[in-house]
Amino acid sequence: MCVCRVDILSRFDIALSLLQSLTHSHTVLRHLCFLPTIIYKHLCEFTISFSSPVISTGQHIDVGDEDYHDGDDDVDYTDDVDDVDDPHGSPSQLLQGGYQRNQHYGGGNYQSGYYRPNKQHGNGYGGQYPKKYGSGYKH
């Protein structure tokens, strides 16, 4: 076992001395030592960028075949903050208590669970908290 380890180390020393003689520079060798780390870092960034999709505001969300949505093939699922008349509700409208027309889960109005100004009943805490802290369930 010790012989194998010495053999591997001697091969490494031979390779290192060959590299030194070829490059005639220690700075190149220093940078070559970091090459596997740099390659690994770039590979990790590359796989992360392709493995986890990021949906930003205004980006089209692909839902596949749209023929089953209300008979309308041109349904636009973009989330545009400036589009106030959109029945889906923009993110800012949802945070302010807007409604979202959820076509994927049976339609109707889906309440966001945040502050709802028109909510008339309490939240089940007996006045312990203000009414704006709702439970988030559909009432």
UniProtKB/Swiss-Prot annotation:
<feature type="compositionally biased region" description="Polar residues">
    <location>
        <begin position="90"/>
        <end position="103"/>
    </location>
</feature>
<dbReference type="InterPro" id="IPR026240">
    <property type="entry name" value="Miracidia_Ag_8I"/>
</dbReference>
<protein>
    <recommendedName>
        <fullName>Immunogenic miracidial antigen 8I'</fullName>
    </recommendedName>
</protein>
<feature type="compositionally biased region" description="Acidic residues">
    <location>
        <begin position="64"/>
        <end position="85"/>
    </location>
</feature>
<comment type="similarity">
    <text>Belongs to the immunogenic miracidial antigen family.</text>
</comment>
<feature type="region of interest" description="Disordered">
    <location>
        <begin position="61"/>
        <end position="139"/>
    </location>
</feature>
